[in-house]
Amino acid sequence: MGKNEWQGAVQPMALRPERQQVAAPCYRKKDDRKQVLLITSRDTGRWIIPKGWPMEDRSDAKAALQEAWEEAGVTGRLTARKPIGHYRYLKLLKDGSTVPVETDVYPVKVKGLATKYPEAGQRKRKWVSPKKAAEMVQEPQLKELLLSL
């Protein structure tokens, strides 16, 4: 990679400030086996866990729980008030650019799934084993977190 390519493409991205998000890996036990709920992203259709931006009126943990409701219709309870870990990814913005995001992870034990919720019809939901979930997501740090659930 030449100097001009670095200055034009890579350097601005590398120097961009990170943004912070919160995520909620949602899980349940079925037949004595743990399952993780994955959802599709609205823009690319790739498999992810519910996540979003922090909320001024809520703790980060409660914001993660709110995202689980809005994006996946999850009702449940937080199993940690502090993040169990973090993962990084590049968020695709509406203008086509990307921004690095660090995501704090707050697990949610699922009590139920609603059929009517804010983003119903915009995403697919799928229950899978933690191992399968780790295979389906792209972010290496998230893969590790899912395997540790």
Which residues fall in each region the model found?
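Acidic, metal-coordinating catalytic segment for phosphate/diphosphate chemistry
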Residues: 1-31
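A residue-level structural signature of the nucleotidyltransferase/glycosyltransferase Rossmann-like core
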Residues: 17-19, 46, 125, 134
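Short beta-strand micro-motifs in enzyme catalytic cores
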Residues: 20, 35, 98-106, 124
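Conserved Nudix-box catalytic region and its N-terminal flanking loop in Nudix hydrolases
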Residues: 32-75
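Short aromatic/basic micro-patch
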Residues: 48, 100, 127
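Active-site segment of metal-dependent pyrophosphate-handling enzymes
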Residues: 73-114
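NUDIX/MutT-family hydrolases
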Residues: 103-147
